Amino acid sequence: MTEMSFLNSEVLAGDLMSPFDQSGLGAEESLGLLDDYLEVAKHFKPHGFSSDKAGSSEWLAMDGLVSASDTGKEDAFSGTDWMLEKMDLKEFDFDALFRMDDLETMPDELLATLDDTCDLFAPLVQETNKEPPQTVNPIGHLPESVIKVDQAAPFTFLQPLPCSPGFLSSTPDHSFSLELGSEVDISEGDRKPDSAAYITLTPQCVKEEDTPSDSDSGICMSPESYLGSPQHSPSTSRAPPDSLPSPGVPRGSRPKPYDPPGVSVTAKVKTEKLDKKLKKMEQNKTAATRYRQKKRAEQEALTGECKELEKKNEALKEKADSLAKEIQYLKDLIEEVRKARGKKRVP
């Protein structure tokens, strides 16, 4: 009896923890684990569950879950019929069981999409060979020991929790009665930003939709895997051709700094002005020297002519003086001759 109750509690714990376990997904895996539990049950000693114990059980509050056997002489499968029946999980008090008094209400759509997100990011982790990104624990205050009770849970029963008032006003009323192997399709309009608390890579997906990407798969990669894959790196795929180093120039050599263009232009202008000024000064010097030489030559010529004329004038003066002397001498001579004739006439 103790072994079967332990098996019952273990299966029920697996049922409750399977929505948060990524390894317990899929109907075929659940059925295979169910067969394993049945094989284990064969080795146990057959015991029957009385209807009184089944009615007073805190875990199973249903009268038809266990078939009563008073004799205890049936086979090993007589007490495992309850495993094939459907159970109504609404009767269980999960808040008291898992100590979730302060846990906020979770939307029903997030519980349904949790399995899809696990299947979506599982192949990405295997391809990139990176550590899986740390996801936020949707059960805020659950201890780690309770979460890792059973890594291979056989069933995936989901209990619809009451939604928040703001979420109920914007989404239609869905009555979830999920069975084994059922699929849930949720439109994009029903998905609210609340899913960012459970999926840490939603902001990266939104950024990838804004910028054009090379792949049309629509899967957003994690930052670790994004850095790991060279074909999706933004530095190599969107780098401008100017930023790539030329093959002729080595990477270590840097271009030498040149003078600013303004300084070189002003220096050229200054040198040109200085050259023009020097040329003009030289031209003025040559012109002045030529002018002085010309004036000097003219002056020398004038002085030479003046000297010659002065010499002629002096010569003429001397000649005039000599003539004047001769005239005076002749006058004196004529006067003496008159006087002498006059004396001769007067006796």
Curated annotation (Swiss-Prot):
- Cite the GO molecular-function annotations of the record: cAMP response element binding protein binding; DNA binding; DNA-binding transcription activator activity, RNA polymerase II-specific; DNA-binding transcription factor activity; DNA-binding transcription factor activity, RNA polymerase II-specific; DNA-binding transcription factor binding; general transcription initiation factor binding; identical protein binding
Q: Does the keyword Kinase apply?
A: no
Organ and tissue specificity: Expressed in brain, heart, liver, spleen, lung and muscle, but not testis.
Q: Which UniProt keywords apply?
A: Acetylation, Activator, Biological rhythms, Cell membrane, Cytoplasm, Cytoskeleton, DNA-binding, Hydroxylation, Isopeptide bond, Membrane, Nucleus, Phosphoprotein, Repressor, Transcription, Transcription regulation, Ubl conjugation
Chain positions with 4-hydroxyproline modification: 234
Q: Where is this region: Disordered?
A: 202-296
What domain notes does the record hold? The BetaTrCP degron motif promotes binding to BTRC when phosphorylated.
What's the name of the protein? Cyclic AMP-dependent transcription factor ATF-4
What species was this sequence derived from? Rattus norvegicus (Rat)
